[in-house]
Swiss-Prot record:
It comes from the Eukaryota. This is Non-specific lipid-transfer protein 12. The lineage of its organism: Eukaryota, Viridiplantae, Streptophyta, Embryophyta, Tracheophyta. GO terms for cellular component: plant-type cell wall. One of its GO terms (molecular function) is lipid binding.
Amino acid sequence: MAFTPKIITCLIVLTIYMASPTESTIQCGTVTSTLAQCLTYLTNSGPLPSQCCVGVKSLYQLAQTTPDRKQVCECLKLAGKEIKGLNTDLVAALPTTCGVSIPYPISFSTNCDSISTAV
């Protein structure tokens, strides 16, 4: 069977489509462990530890694709339901406090499906 240019083009497009990331590689355990140093601060139990901002910046670098950002959002919402005593104002301001600019609000009511990588 001879491969025509049309078949080769279709195979290339199919290969690219299959190789493109459509699912997140970030697990909720990674999100919570990365931000664990922030817990005392976010519950009004202490000052902002420098390691908290290291975690925020690390998580920002990890979540570069739309599926990853959506997953981080869902993980944060889930954690927010489980952790009692969180100061929602401190949670919302945490990226800015740590010098990270993200194009969507941090809130437990954020629609994670609306998050993208567009700035």
